Amino acid sequence: MYLTILFLFVSSILLSLMFLLRKHLSHFSYQNLPPGKTGFPLIGESLSFLSEGRQGRPEKFVTDRVRRFISSSTGVFKTHLFGYPTAVMTGASGNKFLFTNENKLVVSWWPDSVKKIFPYTQSTYTDESKKLRILLMQFMKPEALRKYIGVMDEVAQRHFETLWTNQKQLIVYPLSKKLTFSVACRLFLSMDDPERVSKLEDRFNSVVTGIYSVPIDLPGTRFNRSIKASRLLRKEVCAIIGQRREELKAGRASAEQDVLSHMLMSVGETKDEDLANYLIGILIGGHDTAAIATTFIINYLAEYPHVYQRVLQEQKEILKEKKEEERLKWEDIEKMKYSWNVACEVMRLVPPLTGNFREAIDHFTFKGFYIPKGWKLYWSATATHMNPDYFPEPERFEPNRFEGSGPKPYSYIPFGGGPRMCPGREFARLEILVIIHNLVNRFKWEKVFPNENKIVVDPLPKPGNGLPIRIFPHF
């Protein structure tokens, strides 16, 4: 009896493994697929993909396989990521193909871990999603954002006065996140209470850590903690939405005061849960990009004093023309040419969005290789930005790369591209420049550990030690 049970158990395990192996291999049975390797059944090469990021070198997963499987630096190779066969498109030509074929041959796609952390109804990613995105893009247009520069300036000044002044040493990354999250809450939700903002930020941080984790929902795992935090966060954002609906009905809030009011007055009967999912997404994107860029700008300005001096000189000239207590304006931002070149070079070396996925909605060929319908596609900003064909001596920090006409089209993609390009890129530009202005006019700084440059991508890039610095006020 015991041997029979053991035999049945072992047989079921073997049959399951054979099924998984057969299913895994069936994805790659087409003719003329891109070169590459598929890794292990089910997990594919996901662990290698995640590991390279957590070691601060996300481009290595791509560049190693480009050298091994592709004759040039632009092309396509196959792999298997997050449970799906995946084609990785490389170089400016790959980026252009994906970005210009959005909603024709490819659509946006997220791994299952993201979908479980951010559950959505069918309408969230179809008609309502498109409508919400259009509304957000209207809010994020440069002409619409101009009136918010003074608010950004006010929030930045208060942040540096309360959390940096009188400090001798601090850790940059968490403070950068706190600042940019405060700006996002103020402009998107009209939320200005520091205690309430801090509580919401803690929820967001707990959610983000599990986005690209292994999707095993067991107690104690990062994925499980992220799912729990996501539920609590969604509940809080739904409460904010419900409160705003009442304020709009009672005339205590206006349709023009922030993104939330603008959406509520424009989308009709959209469910609060769907609105909450969308708001959570734009709040993550609305502060993480600027927080990451600001952190690494501070890092590189500490490493290159001559660049810091040139940025300081540019910002001093702007400050000199301002009256006391006068806020920054659009005309001031337009004068920050070199400061923006510095920010662009920082985002080349450390792109806030290291890459992203698409899904093939039809069969197509690229560079002579067949890509089946249903395959996932990945583009890499880090690999493109470190390609010497586009950026000579790519590891060298050189802001002057962005003088004149700048890089080749589709070779510089910190905000993605095509219809799915980050709608908040102009918002991020204004916020980054406002922060630089307030920062360099107040402080000089140095790194506590000058030779420590470890970067961890999990899922977004950040300094391994948070970037501790010593600060020295100008006055």
Curated annotation (Swiss-Prot):
TM annotation in the entry: 2-22
Record keywords, A-Z: Heme, Iron, Membrane, Metal-binding, Monooxygenase, Oxidoreductase, Transmembrane, Transmembrane helix
CDD domains (UniProt xref): CYP90-like
Catalytic activity: beta-amyrin + 3 reduced [NADPH--hemoprotein reductase] + 3 O2 = oleanolate + 3 oxidized [NADPH--hemoprotein reductase] + 4 H2O + 4 H(+)
GO CC terms: membrane
Keyword RNA-binding: no
Molecular functions per Gene Ontology: beta-amyrin 28-monooxygenase activity; heme binding; iron ion binding; oxidoreductase activity, acting on paired donors, with incorporation or reduction of molecular oxygen, reduced flavin or flavoprotein as one donor, and incorporation of one atom of oxygen
Cofactor names: heme
Localization in the cell: Membrane
List of residues binding heme: 422
Record carries keyword Transit peptide: no
One Pfam family this sequence matches: p450
InterPro entries, A to Z: Cyt_P450 (IPR001128), Cyt_P450_CS (IPR017972), Cyt_P450_E_grp-I (IPR002401), Cyt_P450_sf (IPR036396)
EC number: 1.14.14.126
Domain of life of the native organism: Eukaryota
GO biological process: saponin metabolic process; sterol metabolic process
Family label: Belongs to the cytochrome P450 family.
UniProt-recorded name of the protein: Beta-amyrin 28-monooxygenase
Native source species: Barbarea vulgaris (Yellow rocket)
